């Protein structure tokens, strides 16, 4: 076998007939497969052992030679080589065709490659290939032209007239002869000369032809190889035939297709030997052509060949295509051994880095390790014995299993794997039962719940894999989400509830006002029943000397509750005492108001600030903030411990609290009946006005909807004001543990208006709430919206998944390749603000974790706040914003100069670790996942603006994100200015239903016509710049790039993506959108090739374009000129330099056809192409800089160094010598 890790690149090309013969181990002459009686392969058939190798390991067909010792011998009786049966997966055969046939990929593709080379239309080609017309190959001295088509009648006529003075043929043979005649160099030179004069369609076709001819010339492929003289037969184990019970056979479709080819080929040979009439031979040749077409790509031309049940047969092309094809099914996603799957269950007693594995599952997964250990300990005498012990599940294997799984992490994965946190490593702990056990805080990252979800478990085997799992993938390290750098392990449900209850305060509880010297004294008092968790007490600050209490408070007494005292025991000793849930208290000592002044009575203090404590129990959001703050200060290890302690505390507190809910806890609303009666009165009034013709039907509908919406809001308002610290439902909602005000309104108030399946609202509201119960009609109306919700979610999941797939595909080769690309460019970061939506993203958010590109000075004083080339952290970013700086020059991915990746300085901080990104980080994949993963949270809606702005629809949510990344023409497109200047006048032309906006530029004046109903976004006298909107709507990036530059377009796409996500409450970091936007603008379109050998109109990589130009400039020639070219992500993924990656994405046959003609070379720089060939990916620890590290050798002591022992021995030897003398 080839060692994949050794080779650098992979090339594809056309196979010549001789190449196909050289691959082959023999010719397949008969259509037979297996003898149905003996079940042995037939001689010369499709499964022949002489050609493809033995079916049994090291045994020839007749049984004369059996065993490894005969390896390599060819049996003299049956002619089969003695070797492993595995060769049947790699040895190929061939079929010698009696007549040449064309390869359907090159004849049928768009554009037809054969047609371009010969300059013949695909329609004419088809007539020739399928024997409907003759084509003139050599006109001789007749009046005919080369490549002229003749019908049967015309051919006879010309033959009668000219005899043998011309040559015309039909079928693939004619095409082969014509292709042999093509002189590539001559054609290319002629076409280049023609291009100077051609225009329009002819020019486009000429460029296409030139492109193909050039490809043939440069790749060394010969055009006539597009016509096949021999057909390769793929190895039999890739098209197996198996016997089913009942004696029938199941076979791969390919065998049927090969049988048709062989049958027709043999028949044609026979007819040729018999010198049959030309017509019969032609008919057979056509049938052979069709058989080979069906084998290569069934259904591409004409009706597909069908098998039993009218099912089209799967041809070789279908074996590669689509989700079930070779690329996606077997090369990019393989099934692996040492894995299992089971239902998951919660296990609150686990540590954050642990998971529970059921004993029988662990035993099966770690079986080889247990066997080895049993033998090593002498419990089993040999491996066979050990295996028997495991199968019997003897008692002495469990201790060994416990020992074996120590220090061996396992990976847990939950489908759908939306981002990298969907696969994490845990240390296994053996548990009873059959379910995998998961830590409750890991659920958020997996989006897992315990209603029947299943997860898969995998065992890393090699030492390297174990080390990587432990150091890079352990769940305890994954505290921040790569999407935006905020903690992903926020506590939820019971944990939140418990800690909220724990930190509540009540005036007048038992033991109020007691003062304790130490926290331990308070605990004793609690255990004795003297105080409660909610009691307000005093504690001496001196008992916690490591904490920062602020100036002068080190020996004071502070007022807190016993619950908060307990809660603070979770924090590190030197962290502030958190007494109120504010950002200030997280970052600095507790406020002065909580300390007793000298001589002040504690009861007076409680009267003064008691209500402040009562009003501020710790809610869910604040618990998340504490995690962030602890992470910033103490990093992973300590945060992980804090999370486990927080979990333990939450669960135990919610148990002690005894919070339950019942019907009685749902409060009564006082004003609902009156509000509903008033609303009904108003609705009657509206209906009356409609009947009298004072309102249109639409106005009536809108008014009724408004009346009921206001009514529901009023009821909701009353419920929102109901805040009772004793009411369990209220506590759940306010703590953030479960439920929101809307759920509460539906329980206690009214459900309000329901949506119809089309998204309109029913005019009849649901007045009942769930406590009262719904009427039949109300229930029926509610079902529409509920079902729509379900279907929308299902559709959105599919849409979002496909978007993620395209994003990953386009960005997968973006890796951090170097430390600094040395660019002096960057972008100007300022707050992103939208006219309608307000602030989208603040300047602070855009600065954190980025490098500065210029020195930043205070706008007032001029002093330096931050110098150039500094990584801005939270403090620095806040300092810059506080100084009133409006825009900052930062290093950006958009302006990075690294080819095939990004440098560390342009990327900045890795959000998942809050440290500077490391070389080898696969930032492209992370970016794609970060954009795709929240896709399901975006809406699918297209909003109808109801007749404003030319009644266009403004696309939002997921469709808008797709529109941006695919660079499609947006819905509701805005007209933009092409010049810098002033708006001269805005005129309405009622007759033609248009408005005209005149923009006066410095050089010329432009007039733009806009729809009559559109509201201009500018006014007369406004100063505007290129690319500014003249009417509201979305700008088409393809237009924007023409009138402005690449960077402006990139910044526009970035701002729009941010708008789509942040308005839906998803905080996405800029850098992820930047990575993808950069991928869309990696290409340029050549306008004028200058003196380079590039074709006009060619689309190529910017880096390649610069290299070609550099060579020409050095030699003193005229360089080529090009313009920036924007590609949607699907197009960009197909245009990648790697044909393997493109072929495995979409349009497999087209990509491979093109790549083989061009003799493309895949440099294997991305991740997908390396996964496909089974090479370690060039990211992370697979980067050359890590792979090429040589382990340090043991230090050898030079000869001149002696130890004392050596010297003593030497002296001894010398003494002996002298004695012997």
Swiss-Prot record:
Keywords: DNA-directed RNA polymerase, Magnesium, Metal-binding, Nucleotidyltransferase, Transcription, Transferase, Zinc. Mg(2+) binds at residues 449, 451, 453. GO terms for molecular function: DNA binding; DNA-directed RNA polymerase activity; magnesium ion binding; zinc ion binding. Zn(2+) 1 binds at residues 60, 62, 75, 78. Zn(2+) 2 binds at residues 821, 896, 903, 906. It is an enzyme of class 2 (transferase). The keyword Magnesium applies. GO terms for biological process: DNA-templated transcription. GO terms for cellular component: DNA-directed RNA polymerase complex. Binds 1 Mg(2+) ion per subunit. Binds 2 Zn(2+) ions per subunit. The RNAP catalytic core consists of 2 alpha, 1 beta, 1 beta' and 1 omega subunit. When a sigma factor is associated with the core the holoenzyme is formed, which can initiate transcription. This is DNA-directed RNA polymerase subunit beta'. It comes from Lactobacillus delbrueckii subsp. bulgaricus (strain ATCC 11842 / DSM 20081 / BCRC 10696 / JCM 1002 / NBRC 13953 / NCIMB 11778 / NCTC 12712 / WDCM 00102 / Lb 14).
């Amino acid at each position: 076998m080839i060692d994949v890790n050794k080779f650098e690149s992979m090339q594809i090309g056309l196979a010549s007939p001789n190449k196909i013969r050289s691959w082959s181990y023999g010719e397949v002459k008969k259509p037979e497969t297996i003898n149905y009686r003996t079940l042995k392969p037939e001689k010369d058939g499709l499964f022949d052992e002489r050609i493809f190798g033995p079916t049994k390991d090291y045994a020839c067909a007749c049984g004369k030679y059996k065993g490894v010792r005969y390896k390599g011998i060819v049996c003299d009786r049956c002619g089969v080589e003695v070797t492993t049966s595995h060769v049947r997966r790699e040895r190929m055969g061939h079929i010698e065709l009696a007549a040449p046939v064309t390869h359907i990929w090159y004849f049928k593709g768009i554009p037809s490659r054969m047609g371009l080379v010969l300059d013949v239309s695909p329609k004419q080609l088809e007539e020739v290939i399928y024997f409907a017309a003759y084509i003139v190959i050599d006109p001789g001295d007749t009046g005919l032209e080369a490549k002229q088509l003749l019908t049967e009648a015309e051919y006879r006529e010309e033959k009668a007239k000219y005899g043998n003075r011309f040559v015309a043929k039909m079928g693939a043979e004619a095409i082969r002869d014509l292709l042999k005649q093509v002189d590539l160099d001559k054609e290319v030179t002629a076409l280049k000369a023609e291009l100077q004069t051609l225009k329009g369609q002819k020019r486009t076709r000429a460029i296409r032809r030139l492109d193909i001819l050039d490809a043939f010339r440069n790749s060394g492929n010969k055009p006539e190889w597009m016509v096949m003289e021999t057909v390769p037969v793929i190895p039999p184990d890739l098209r197996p035939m198996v016997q089913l019970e009942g004696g029938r056979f199941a076979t791969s479709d390919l065998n049927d297709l090969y049988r048709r080819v062989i049958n027709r080929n043999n028949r044609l040979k026979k007819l040729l030997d018999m010198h049959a009439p030309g017509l019969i031979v032609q008919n057979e040749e056509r049938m052979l052509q069709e058989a080979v077409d069906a084998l290569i790509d069934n259904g591409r031309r004409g009706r597909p060949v069908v098998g039993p049940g009218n099912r089209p047969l799967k041809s070789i092309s279908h074996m590669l295509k689509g989700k079930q094809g070779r690329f996606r099914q077997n090369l990019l996603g393989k099934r692996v051994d040492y894995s299992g799957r089971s239902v998951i269950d919660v296990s609150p007693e686990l540590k954050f880095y642990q998971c529970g594995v059921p004993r029988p599952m662990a035993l099966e997964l770690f079986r080889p390790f247990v066997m080895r250990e049993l033998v090593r300990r002498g419990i089993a005498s040999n491996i066979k014995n050990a295996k028997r012990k495991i199968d019997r599940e003897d008692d002495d294997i469990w201790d060994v299993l416990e020992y074996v799984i120590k220090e061996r992490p396992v990976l847990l994965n939950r489908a759908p794997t939306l981002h990298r946190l969907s696969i994490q490593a845990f240390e296994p702990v053996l548990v009873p039962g059959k379910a995998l056990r998961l830590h409750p805080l890991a659920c958020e990252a997996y989006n897992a719940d315990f209603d029947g979800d299943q997860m898969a478990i995998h065992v890393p085997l090699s030492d390297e894999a174990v080390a990587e799992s432990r150091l890079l993938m352990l769940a305890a390290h994954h505290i921040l989400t790569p999407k935006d750098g905020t903690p992903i392990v926020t506590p939820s449900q019971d944990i939140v509830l418990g800690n909220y209850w724990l930190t509540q305060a009540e005036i007048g509880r038992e033991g109020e006002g007691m003062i304790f010297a130490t926290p331990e004294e308070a605990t004793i008092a609690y255990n004795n029943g003297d105080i409660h968790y909610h009691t307000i007490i005093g504690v001496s600050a001196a008992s916690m000397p490591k904490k920062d209490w602020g100036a002068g408070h080190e020996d004071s007494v502070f007022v807190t509750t016993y619950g908060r005292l307990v809660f603070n025991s979770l924090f590190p000793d030197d962290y502030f005492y958190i007494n109120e849930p504010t950002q200030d208290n997280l970052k600095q000592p507790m406020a002065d108001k909580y300390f007793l002044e000298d001589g002040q009575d504690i009861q007076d203090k409680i009267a003064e600030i008691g209500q402040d404590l009562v009003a501020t129990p710790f809610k869910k959001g604040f618990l998340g903030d504490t995690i962030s703050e602890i992470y910033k200060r103490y990093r992973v290890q300590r945060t992980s411990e804090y999370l486990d302690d927080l979990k333990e505390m939450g669960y135990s507190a919610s148990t002690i609290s005894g919070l339950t809910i019942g019907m009685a806890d749902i409060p009564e609303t006082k004003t609902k009946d009156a509000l509903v009666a008033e609303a009904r009165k108003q609705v009657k009034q509206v209906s009356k006005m409609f009947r009298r013709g004072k309102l249109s039907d639409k106005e009536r509908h809108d008014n009724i909807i408004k009346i009921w919406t206001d009514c529901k809001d009023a009821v909701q308002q009353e419920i929102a004001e109901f805040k009772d610290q004793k009411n369990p439902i209220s506590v759940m909602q306010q703590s953030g543990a479960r439920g929101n005000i809307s759920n509460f309104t539906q329980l206690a108030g009214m459900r309000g208006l329901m949506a119809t399946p089309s998204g309109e609202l029913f005019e009849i509201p649901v007045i009942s709430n769930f406590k009262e119960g719904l009427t039949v009609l109300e229930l029926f109306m509610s079902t529409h919206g509920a079902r729509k919700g379900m279907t929308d979610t299902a559709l959105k999941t599919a849409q979002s998944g496909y978007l993620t797939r395209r994003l990953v595909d386009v960005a997968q080769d973006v890796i951090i390749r170097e430390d600094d690309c040395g660019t002096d460019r960057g972008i100007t970061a300022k707050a992103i603000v939208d006219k309608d939506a307000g602030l989208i993203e603040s300047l602070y958010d855009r600065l954190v974790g980025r490098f500065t590109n210029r020195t930043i000075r205070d706008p007032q004083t001029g002093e330096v706040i931050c110098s150039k080339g500094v990584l801005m952290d939270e403090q620095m970013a806040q300092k810059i914003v506080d100084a009133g700086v409006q825009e900052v020059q930062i290093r950006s991915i958009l302006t990075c100069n690294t080819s095939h990746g990004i440098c560390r300085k342009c990327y900045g901080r890795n959000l998942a670790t809050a440290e500077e990104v490391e070389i080898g980080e696969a930032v492209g994949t992370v970016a794609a996942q970060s954009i795709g993963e929240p896709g399901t949270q975006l809406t699918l809606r297209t909003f109808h603006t109801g007749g404003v702005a030319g009644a266009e629809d403004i696309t939002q949510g997921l469709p808008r994100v797709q529109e941006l990344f695919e660079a499609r023409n947006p819905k509701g497109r805005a007209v933009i200015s092409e010049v810098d200047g002033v708006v001269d006048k805005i005129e309405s032309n009622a007759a033609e239903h248009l408005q005209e906006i005149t923009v006066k530029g410095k050089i010329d004046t432009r007039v733009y016509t806009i729809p009559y109903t559109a509201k201009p976004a500018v006014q007369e006298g406004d100063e505007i710049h290129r690319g500014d909107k003249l009417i509201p709507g979305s700008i088409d990036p393809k237009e924007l790039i023409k009138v402005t530059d690449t960077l402006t377009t990139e910044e526009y796409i970035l701002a729009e993506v941010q708008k789509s996500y942040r308005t839906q409450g998803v905080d996405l970091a800029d850098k992820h959108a930047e990575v993808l936007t950069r991928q869309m603008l990696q290409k340029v379109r050549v306008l004028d090739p200058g003196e380079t050998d590039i074709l006009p109109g060619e689309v190529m990589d910017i880096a390649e374009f610069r290299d070609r130009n550099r060579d020409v400039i050095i030699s003193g020639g005229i360089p080529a000129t090009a313009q920036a070219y924007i590609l949607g992500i699907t197009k960009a993924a197909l245009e990648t330099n790697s044909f393997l990656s493109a072929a495995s994405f979409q349009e497999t046959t087209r990509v491979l056809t093109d790549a083989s003609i061009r003799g493309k070379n895949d440099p294997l720089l991305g991740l997908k192409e390396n996964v496909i060939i089974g090479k370690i990916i060039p990211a992370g620890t697979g980067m050359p800089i890590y792979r090429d590290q040589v382990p340090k050798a043991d230090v050898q002591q030079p000869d001149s160094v002696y130890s004392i022992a050596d010297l003593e021995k030497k002296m001894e030897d010398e003494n002996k010598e002298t004695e012997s003398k």
